[in-house]
Design a protein with these regions (language model features):
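AMP-binding/adenylate-forming catalytic core of the ANL superfamily
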Residues: 88, 95, 105, 260, ...
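Conserved pre-ATP/AMP-binding loop-to-beta segment of ANL
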Residues: 147-166, 170-173, 207-216
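Conserved AMP-binding/adenylate-forming
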Residues: 2, 28, 45-88, 436
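Structural core segment of the AMP-binding/adenylate-forming
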Residues: 48-49, 76-144
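Flexible, low-complexity linker/hinge segments
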Residues: 1-4, 135-159
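Conserved AMP-binding/adenylation subdomain of ANL enzymes
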Residues: 186-219, 224-268, 281, 285-288
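Conserved AMP-binding A3 loop
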Residues: 31-33, 160-197
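Gly/Ser/Thr-rich phosphate-binding loop
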Residues: 237-240, 265-269, 280-348, 357-359, ...
Length: 530
């Protein structure tokens, strides 16, 4: 009997369209049959080294077929795959290996030094599998040749996947998702490309795949980022082709070349940090500076999740490609994908029409009344907690009445008509003279100004107001009239939300997938000469 375990779902697709191309990476292609077979062999390797149900398997890999075969291979034996941010310091890696209780680690050779340094702090995953060498661990390719695919573990809907958060407010936390819950809450339940919506039984996936459109999807963020992994899995479980860049670091020019060569239809990004270089390269191409080397007839959608995709940049994309659909979706590792707000809003960053799975929770104990603010929450198929952290789990995953909720961290308000306005990241809220200011709203306004390329907004100490609003920004012109910036902001924002001080930098610092580094921005603002 088929389950919603992701290895089972991949096998359903592979049995339905075995010869269809599943994955393109550089010059290599994998059919669905080959992807499924290689995943089984990785599962056999893990099993041969004592890895089994419930054991944690880390994936410290750049975007590559091995990331996915490692992921599905772990799923196939009931083990628990988890993402490892390869930009972490040895100290952060040590913390991650130890707290995750990793039984196995699949990694690229280029990370051997960092892994050695981390393991020198007295925790070493027992099974080390190196995909492109044997400097530190066993060579995965060699190990695959030694095994045969034998007994298949009985799979369950409740087998777990752990997704570690970005760690922007301290060490990362591992969110434990049952496969079935993640399939429906983050991947749309197989319904993103079908008018009938989500499936109800795993076997229905075969019909969806055989009858569906043949689309090409390209995630530009690393697969270690939840949004990129979710985009990839959505495409694979729809029988689409997934294109992964063979460049270790994001490069807009290379991305457009791949989009053209592979006739990509759907591109997934993470916020303005990716959107800005992409649209600048696109505009240069459109202006003839690149001699129109990127005909993009097949591209119809660019979607962002995990960070702000500003309206200004969305408009720049559609100015060049008028038929392009651009979207910005809200979501979190703890809540899954919430989608784009359907309603216009004069405040905050997004507004949702009333729906059964979205609520505003106050103090983690009760649902908000109309007009009341709290934390945005999702009910239904939600995670079961943070791995190894019962205290944080109790704070984030709550039960009200007999309904389970996951709190995503965004402040929100229940409106009089039942709709929900998302105000911004609650942990970043600035309190100035008793008024709340959410950085994302101010950042979106500033980014609409033609000279501002990127900005982070933080609160800094103020003798009278407690905190004042500070903007750390970079610009595309030599000189900026900051008073003019204030006046521009005041056209859209209440006076207390307008930045009182500005700090210009060469580059606004973000992490590898474009998420803001607010600690850095705060240090810039606080350490600047007064």
């Amino acid at each position: 009997m088929r389950t919603f375990n992701f290895a089972d779902l991949l096998e359903i697709v592979a049995e339905t369209v075995p010869e269809r191309i599943a994955l393109v990476h550089g010059q290599s292609e994998l059919s669905y049959s080959a992807l499924n077979e290689q995943s089984k062999r990785v599962a056999a390797v893990l099993s041969s080294h004592g890895v089994g149900r419930g054991d944690q398997v880390g994936l410290q890999l750049i975007n590559s077929p091995e990331y996915l075969t490692g992921f599905f291979g772990a799923c196939r034996i009931g083990a628990v795959p988890f993402n490892v941010n390869y930009r972490y310091s040895p100290n952060e890696l040590h913390h991650l290996y130890k707290t995750s209780r990793a039984k196995a680690l699949i990694f690229n050779r280029q990370f051997s030094r960092e892994i050695k340094d981390a393991c020198a702090r007295n925790y070493l995953p027992p099974v080390l599998l190196e995909v492109d060498g044997n400097e530190l661990g066993l060579n995965l390719v060699d190990e695959i040749t030694k095994v045969s695919v034998g007994h298949v573990e009985k799979l369950n809907d409740t087998d777990l996947i752990i997704i570690f958060t970005g760690g922007t407010t301290g060490y990362p936390k591992g969110v434990m998702w049952p496969h079935k819950h993640l399939f429906f809450s983050a991947l749309g339940g197989g319904g993103f490309f079908h008018a009938d919506g989500a499936i109800s039984e795993p076997k229905e996936l075969a019909t969806r795949v055989s009858e569906g459109m043949l689309l090409v999807t390209m995630p530009l963020a690393p697969l270690m980022h939840g949004a990129a992994l979710w985009t990839t899995l959505i495409a694979l479980f729809a029988g689409h082709k997934v294109v992964l860049s063979d460049e270790a670091n994001f490069d807009a020019t290379h991305a457009w070349q791949l989009i053209r060569e592979q006739q990509v239809n759907i591109v997934s990004i993470v916020g303005d940090a990716m959107a800005l270089p992409l649209v600048e390269a696109l505009e240069a191409n459109q202006a003839g500076l690149e001699q129109d080397r990127w005909p993009l007839d097949g591209l119809f959608h660019i979607g962002s999740g995990g960070a702000i995709f500003s309206q200004t940049l969305q408009k720049r994309f559609t100015n060049v490609l008028p038929n392009l659909i651009v979207s910005s979706s809200l979501g979190a590792t703890e809540t899954g994908t919430l989608g784009a707000g359907e309603l216009e809003t004069e405040e905050g960053i997004m507004r949702y029409a009333p729906r059964g799975d979205l609520e505003v929770v106050v103090d983690g104990m009760r649902l908000a009344m109309k007009g009341e603010e709290g934390i945005l929450a999702r009910s239904g198929m939600v995670p079961v907690g943070y791995f190894g952290d019962e205290e944080k789990s109790r704070e984030t995953f709550v039960t009200i009445g007999d309904v389970s909720y996951a709190l995503g961290g965004d402040a929100a308000r229940r409106e009089e008509d039942g709709s929900v306005t998302v105000l911004g990241r609650g942990s970043m809220c600035i309190n100035t003279g008793g008024e709340k200011v959410f950085p994302e709203e101010v950042e979106s306004t500033m980014k609409a100004h033609a000279v501002v390329d990127d900005v982070l907004v933080v609160g800094v100490a103020h003798e009278k107001w407690g905190q004042q609003v500070a903007a750390v920004y970079c610009a595309n012109v030599p000189e900026v009239d900051e008073q003019q910036l204030r006046e521009f902001c005041r056209e859209s924002l209440a006076g207390y939300k307008v930045p009182k001080v500005f700090f210009r930098v060469d580059t606004v610092q973000r992490n590898v997938v474009g998420k803001p580094d607010y600690a850095w921005a705060k240090s810039v603002a606080e350490d600047a000469p007064s």
